[in-house]
Amino acid sequence: MFVPYGSLMRYLFPALLLHGLGEGSALLHPDSRSHPRSLEKSAWRAFKESQCHHMLKHLHNGARITVQMPPNIEGHWVSTGCEVRAGPEFITRSYRFYHNNTFKAYQFYYGGNRCTNPIYTLVIRGKIRLRQASWIIRGGTEADYQLRNIQIISHNEAVAKKLSELVNNTCPGFIPEDSPWEQDVSYDLLREENGCECTKALNFAMHELQLIRVEKQYLHHNLDHLVEELFLGDIHTDATQRRYYRPSSYQPPLQNAKNHDRTCIACRIIYRSDEHHPPILPPKADLTIGLHGEWVSQRCEVRPEVLFLTRHFIFHDNNNTWEGHYYHYSDPICKHPTFTIYAKGRYSRGVHSAKVMGGTEFVFKVNHMKVTPMDVSTASLLNVFNGNECGAQGSWQVGVQQDVTHTNGCIALGIRLPHTEYEIFKMEQDARGRYLLYNGQRPSDGSSPDRPEKRATSYQMPLIQCASSVPRSEESPEENKIRLYSSRAPAKHPSASALALVLFICTVSYWDILS
């Protein structure tokens, strides 16, 4: 079987490098005869690993999340904070879906990464119709939409002038020369009944409505605290391609204004806002990035083209080394594992980004990697490939880890070693004071940010800190982690294996992960 190397390399390293694996570690049992210092380190390692393991185990047990199929999107949905889109663009969203399938969506745009200075607002009206369950993204629902009207309102004179020039350069004569746009006045960018349309000036599209997922969960096991989240399709990282892109992943979720996390201050502010009163979020200071300690996924994450995973990163700031555990699954709630990847390398401290306000730039190098197939289909697929380009030929077994460093990675998974990526990070605190770590969003075209000019300008879903420091750089007990990870995965049923094989082949044919 031949799988295009270029396609593989586009998506596997993205999922790899800082995309995601991760179940927490097993507890270590120190030898009672060990040196006191070793006992102290072992005890600390056991504690931090128990914390990280507990947080990821919660995800792998379904995190008590209910997915609505088909989704009920009727209601008012709002952003939970200041979102960053590629460009960068800083935005908050407020979407209303009505029982007659119509919708009204506000997109509030800002001049900074804290969403404190609104510059313009789009008001989008249209109609949406849910279709079938997505055959590409499991757990998602496909939808069609039709736009009826789009209005734009500038919130200061300089922006009104700039937008007027942009629109007229794109659509000559769209705005009469004697009637330039003014501040706080609504103007049509699209009106269905008279054919008025110039959305391409802003590279605007609402294709996010083509992929939908609704999740429900009760926070802290409290039946009185229901939270509903609406996931809409991802936005292409190249603004010029947004009008032609069909989503294959998700944006950060919106929360139902009626059933939202009560600690979400931004939710309440955005809920009360409109085009004449855009939301102004509370100002926050940018946190200094400190890459140390351990960080894990907060949810089962979705990557383009049938890739579901969780991540666990370990940073050793004493010597600038890092480790990443990436656990991949065939399902959107991360219950059925397919393979794991353990990677490690070095990172260099960068500088504050001149392009993305609030971001800090890093360079990551990967020089060591291990792979573990977690189901029969994946092991079989790895054994199909000829030559020693992914571990020892024909030697792959379910649950048995192999070091692929000596074969310069794994061509079957699209991984080449050594590999360098140019990253961007930011750090925030949630309403409960917990630290969140964001790293760069993978390019939508599947390429790798292997040059400075390809560095991301937006972010992935955040990781949450599960251990604040790491005593010293050492390889964590991967065998124990894999045993825990695989203990709940009955991957030998023929039907499950067949499905996993199809999913794996479809995914691998589009990956290009550490290229």
UniProtKB/Swiss-Prot annotation:
One of its GO terms (biological process) is Wnt signaling pathway. GO terms for cellular component: plasma membrane. It is found in: Cell membrane. Glycans are attached at N100, N168, N319. Residues 1-26 form the signal peptide. Pfam families: APCDDC. The keyword Iron does not apply. The chain crosses the membrane at residues 491-508. Keywords: Cell membrane, Glycoprotein, Membrane, Signal, Transmembrane, Wnt signaling pathway. One of its GO terms (molecular function) is Wnt-protein binding. InterPro entries: APCDD1 (IPR042425), APCDD1_dom (IPR029405). Its main location: membrane. Residues 27-490 are extracellular. It comes from the Eukaryota. It is a single-pass type I membrane protein. Residues 509-515 are cytoplasmic. Negative regulator of the Wnt signaling pathway. Inhibits Wnt signaling in a cell-autonomous manner and functions upstream of beta-catenin. Belongs to the APCDD1 family. This is Protein APCDD1.
